[in-house]
Amino acid sequence: MSKLIGEPVKVHRNKDSTLTSFIWRKRFYRVDEVISWWREPSEWWNGKAMRLFVRVNARNSSTGTYELYKLGEEWFLHRVLD
């Protein structure tokens, strides 16, 4: 199961551009593992850019799996996986 979110997040990356943490709803999540990266078109019929997705294991008070995506210069939490 998963829950679609679609809310903006603030992402932190190291100097190698690896995702290290993100802030969602004023809560800090530390990324323990980057599981995968991929690209998907975003409303190609409107000329919008590709979205860069990343699936991570991250923790706040407990560990979870999250999918985030970057569209332009902005990052969003796409879904939370159970």
Model-found features: residue ranges?
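N- and C-terminal low-complexity/disordered segments
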Residues: M1-D82
